[in-house]
Regions:
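Noncatalytic linker/hinge segments flanking ATPase motor cores
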Residues: 41-44, 219-224, 244
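Beta-lactam-recognizing serine transpeptidase/beta-lactamase-like catalytic domain environment
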Residues: 1-217
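Short alpha-helix boundary/capping segments
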Residues: 145, 196, 222-230
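Short amphipathic alpha-helical face segments that pack within enzyme cores
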Residues: 97-103, 229-236
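A short, terminal or domain-edge coil/loop segment
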Residues: 55-57, 61, 225-232
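Short, gly/Ser/Thr-rich active-site loops of penicillin-recognizing serine hydrolases
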Residues: 130-138, 233-244
Length: 244
């Protein structure tokens, strides 16, 4: 799809690989400029005292360039606590496709098995109706999250669609529904930009609670609150899938 990327989940390794080389180039460029500047000045120095003074200036400037590099690495390359906090709430460098979000939810509620997505379930012979190809589920990996934490997240998602949850009202007319969800309001732009107040509506959900069969991810561009927009899409999917 034009404009779509494969998405990524931030990690210490990703951050270092993404931003580390840029700051290394900046440092090397700055030091090279200092070396070139003082090579000329030293060549034109008239006496030893002037050369010593220039060497000291050069050393200080190189030290300053190194210090600036270390500062940048500390905050923009090395993983910080705020990166963990941002990632935990879906902010920061997170970037996911709707399919990845749906698979994310499926992984949580199936006990931690990340499955290989596929589009075609089976192929039938158009004449005989015989199954000539049947896709088989493939487990990509088991996530390193304890069963207790997975169950805790699943339970928390169920509270979103019940009681005073942010999506409880969405399912009031659907007593058959038992599952869970997470509403989302994805900020498009940063503060003090034209896009500051624009948001996409997101909604991820699963059903039923005890034996999950389906996970859904819906995104409505400029949809603001997920429960008001994308949630309606997920609700329609559940109704169609379960025949409610």
């Amino acid at each position: 799809i034009p404009g779509e990327s494969k998405g990524y989940a931030p990690s210490p390794e990703w951050k270092k690989a993404t931003y580390g080389p840029n700051f290394e180039k900046q440092r090397d460029k700055a030091i090279a400029a200092i070396e070139a500047e003082y090579a000329k000045k030293l060549a034109e120095a008239e006496d030893e005292e002037t050369r010593n003074k220039l060497e000291k200036e050069k050393k200080n400037k190189i030290s300053a360039a190194e210090a600036e590099y270390q500062y940048n690495v500390r905050w923009y390359v090395d993983w910080q606590y705020f990166d963990t906090f941002n990632t935990a709430i879906g902010q920061g460098y997170n970037s996911y496709t709707p399919l990845q979000l749906a698979n994310y939810v499926a992984t949580i509620v199936n006990g931690g098995k990340r499955m290989q997505p596929y589009v075609v379930d089976k192929i039938l012979d158009p004449v005989t109706g015989e199954v000539v190809y049947q896709n088989q589920p493939v487990v990509r990996n088991i996530v390193s999250v304890s069963p207790e934490n997975l169950e805790l997240i699943k339970e928390a998602m169920s509270k979103v669609t019940s009681g005073e949850g942010t999506a409880a009202a969405l399912f009031l007319d659907m007593p058959e529904f038992s599952g869970g969800a997470k509403t989302g309001t994805a900020q498009i732009g940063s503060k003090n930009t034209e896009l500051e107040d624009l948001t996409n509506g997101l909604f991820v959900a699963f059903a039923p609670y005890d034996d999950p069969q389906i996970a859904v991810a819906a995104v409505i561009e400029y949809g603001e609150h997920g429960s008001d927009t994308a949630g309606l899409v997920a609700k329609a999917v559940f109704k169609q899938y379960f025949g409610w």
